[in-house]
Amino acid sequence: MDKKAIFTQVSSLEERIGDLHDELRGLKEQLAYLIEENHYLHVENENLRKRLEPEAGTKNTVTPSGESSRKKMVGEGHENLARLYQEGFHICNTHYGSIRPEGDDCLFCLSFLHQK
């Protein structure tokens, strides 16, 4: 092969890699958005269930494994961290309190929000 053909192939490969990188970035943004939306829907669902279940019937119910049948409520601190993340701050232990770059989601923060 001559040098021009090799250069053309390398240039073509570089362009395809750039396109794949852009596509991967878009998928990462979509995934982060879906994880975050799933978290908020989960919290909202728990709050709605809490309103619907009768207070007297579920407080003392225990499953065979010894756990309370009532789901653990998301605490006020967790909601505050979710609000801080929405406002553009890191809540992960790696970058806690620093400002996230505009439009960039942190997978560490999102995994922390989605913990059970």
Swiss-Prot record:
Residues 58-67 have a biased composition (Polar residues). The lineage of its organism: Bacteria, Bacillati, Bacillota, Bacilli, Bacillales. Its cofactor is Zn(2+). Keywords: Cytoplasm, DNA replication, DNA replication inhibitor, Metal-binding, Zinc. Binds 1 zinc ion per subunit. The keyword Metal-binding applies. Homotetramer. Interacts with both DnaA and DnaN, acting as a bridge between these two proteins. Residues 52-73 are annotated as: Disordered. InterPro entries: YabA (IPR010377). Belongs to the YabA family. It comes from the Bacteria. Involved in control of chromosome replication initiation. Inhibits the cooperative binding of DnaA to the oriC region, thus negatively regulating initiation of chromosome replication. Inhibits the ability of DnaA-ATP to form a helix on DNA; does not disassemble preformed DnaA-DNA helices. Decreases the residence time of DnaA on the chromosome at its binding sites (oriC, replication forks and promoter-binding sites). Tethers DnaA to the replication machinery via the DNA polymerase beta sliding clamp subunit (dnaN). One of its GO terms (biological process) is DNA replication. It comes from Shouchella clausii (strain KSM-K16). Zn(2+) binds at residues 90, 92, 106, 109. It is found in: Cytoplasm, Nucleoid. GO terms for cellular component: nucleoid. This is Replication initiation control protein YabA.
